[in-house]
């Protein structure tokens, strides 16, 4: 139904909708008195209300009854506290969204104040104290996308469950009368996934309230940080938020030494070549959240204690590497156990003493590592005390492009051979038991004069799990050992290649900055150069077509030049006279000989040598047998 008045009158429409909420209304204002006078002459009768009730429209009948009762009161006697809305553009910009799911509000009767709500479907309920004094059965109105005129008393505290910010269409500004005042509905939000429920007072400051149209909280204007991000934040914009140095916890499943020194990190005994489990987890304030982007990168490394500078550490590592039976021997290895690979990804051997991997802080990560060096491997003298080593773990934010870790922890280790860790623990237990017996005997003598009871002396207990100690220093760079040997599975001297496509550029920058080319400062190790040259030599067996015995051609370098020098030395051909060099396969394919064929496909192969004299020089063809 609708009616149009004079110039000072406005069109008001009440439209019942067929959706779940039985009654939707357009936004109404207090300046519509003249528009309602004609309807007051024909009030709702009991028969009309009964007919509407039969048709299942009790809420519409109740709402119309409230409106009729309201407009029967003269305008000058009403208690109206709806203020004039500001016409400034700033207020219009603030009218964004206020979203939740499916609205239902319980109203109290007998009052004649007007409350205007603008919202998308929310799940609303009055506070307990207000519900006890209200007549919910008589005046229950469901509010959906449209606005409703609702009589309430005072300031109504409303509780919103499962609050989720949404974005609405640009707001439309409606002018209000001069006598209107601003009214407020205070939303008390139930915070999900939080250990404690924050009261609605935490969102207000000095009893100030914002209008329902505003999505800006007063507490955010004074510099306070908001607790929830908008759903429009993309994955690339998210940076893992660390709350302090105690965010992460690492444990090593190895026997802890019984002789721990005060002020130093935990000491653990390991056996060389034996795998031990390391567990990584998050234990800080962020643990109660399910992070949307929660991947971090951790680097596990074996380093020397802090009293050794970079040059000393590299000197020790080079000495150890020169005494190994193979140049591929690593200081630290990670096992390819299924239990480990289910919790980590993107594993990289970034250095001989370090491995890198990514893991999800929402889940506990577990890796298995082994240390391949002894504590006494860094000196040629026998009987010297071994150097203390450390297992250090640096954790970096996955999307952050800084080379500064967000957390760092370490554990001291001593590495023994042939079950030496167990023998060391047994020796410490025997020494501790002897001290315990002596202590109890002396304590008994002291207490015999009093009550004859012996006081127990606190002793260190054996523990099979060692907790890493957090390091406050996050700025110093660890020393990563990368010898001057090229291997396909090793990313060396800052050249980092990732195995998956979802890696971020920030992580690559992080790893590149962590180590420097050693040959720039120290040069390659001579012993390694000799071994490398021995591996690169190529041996070929050749004979002429009419010969029965093969000649051996030893190439000093696996190149075309090396082959030409070997032919010149064996058959007396000037190197500069060899103009063409071909290889003919068993299938009869003739190809130009190049360095790649000689190095990778010709070692210890047999060929028939064919030499043709030409004007410009010799044409040599090696036919594969």
UniProtKB/Swiss-Prot annotation:
Domain Grh/CP2 DB: 244-482
Region listing for Disordered, in residue ranges: 198-222, 428-452
InterPro entries associated with the record: CP2, TF_CP2-like
Compositional bias per record (Polar residues), positions renumbered to this chain: 440-451
Site note Important for activation of transcription, residues: 423
UniProt record, GO biological process: anterior neural tube closure; bicellular tight junction assembly; brain development; camera-type eye development; cardiac ventricle morphogenesis; cell adhesion; cell junction assembly; embryonic cranial skeleton morphogenesis
Gene inactivation effect: Mutant embryos show an epithelial and anterior and posterior neural tube defects leading to death at around 11.5 dpc. They exhibit a fully penetrant split-face malformation, associated with cranioschisis. Closure of the remainder of the neural tube ocrurred normally with the exception of the posterior neuropore. The dorso-lateral hinge points fail to form and closure do not proceed beyond this point.
Listed transmembrane segments: none
Pfam families (alphabetical): CP2, GRHL1_C
Subcellular location as annotated: Nucleus; Membrane
Assembly information from the UniProt record: Homodimer, also forms heterodimers with GRHL1 or GRHL3.
Family per record: Belongs to the grh/CP2 family. Grainyhead subfamily.
Additional free-text comment from the UniProt record: GRHL genes (GRHL1, GRHL2 and GRHL3) show a paradoxal lack of redundancy despite their extensive sequence identity in the DNA-binding and protein dimerization domains and the fact that the core consensus DNA binding sites are identical. They have related but remarkably different functions during embryogenesis because of their differential spatiotemporal expression patterns during development.
Chain's role: Transcription factor playing an important role in primary neurulation and in epithelial development. Binds directly to the consensus DNA sequence 5'-AACCGGTT-3' acting as an activator and repressor on distinct target genes. During embryogenesis, plays unique and cooperative roles with GRHL3 in establishing distinct zones of primary neurulation. Essential for closure 3 (rostral end of the forebrain), functions cooperatively with GRHL3 in closure 2 (forebrain/midbrain boundary) and posterior neuropore closure.
Protein's name in the database: Grainyhead-like protein 2 homolog
Species in which this protein is naturally found: Mus musculus (Mouse)
Gene: Grhl2
